[in-house]
């Protein structure tokens, strides 16, 4: 959960709010100036992840897996990777390196993602959604 403190709120008010919200999920206090960036990342992010899961599933189907199996495997893979990032606190790049063998299948797949500019495309999507949020906020 995300919250911003009002102008008259004290630091203690912010800490209390964070503690209360943390009881039902992860809570972050951010400056109002960052709310559009939060929208670009977390507000629009689920759609990006759904599209990635769909593409991963499509790849599985192209490789011969039945659609239902491919979709479940793709979703479980994303869930497991996300849990590892959250539970270990390690940088995603470090976790990626831990599962990438020299000359193996994973590095071959990662090379294809780099050729397709996956990272740049995702970064640009977050930036575009952030800018759109700013424009919508201006009326």
Regions found by a protein language model. Name each.
Residues 45:
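Aromatic-residue-lined binding/catalytic grooves and analogous aromatic/hydrophobic interfacial grooves
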Residues 42:
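Phosphate/pyrophosphate- and phosphate-bearing ligand-binding catalytic cores of soluble enzymes
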